[in-house]
Amino acid sequence: MAFVTVSHWTSTEISEEMISTANEKFIPLIMGVGASGVQMVRTGELSLCVVTQYPDAAAAQTAQAKIAEIREQVAQDFPMTMVSAHGGEVTGSSELHQIKN
């Protein structure tokens, strides 16, 4: 069963440069430790969350030591603080796939 983690972050600033760096540097690092998907979601002017999908709980557990290192690096590189992190097995989901003309 798929597993998802969500980490909540606050910052003193969120610039386009920070977002670009996160997309180019940190998302590939997260994907490289076994994630099957990751999204950064801006939840406020100075807050965001990172939603990471894994194929299963075992993959998520295996990745956690490296994820902790990545989170530490984010906090060093940016004026950001992780407020909380949660995770659990996916109990239901749906996706809408749009057909491009």
What are these regions (language model features)?
Residues 1-72, 76-101:
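Short S/T/G/P-rich N-terminal loop/turn motif that feeds into the first structured element of a domain
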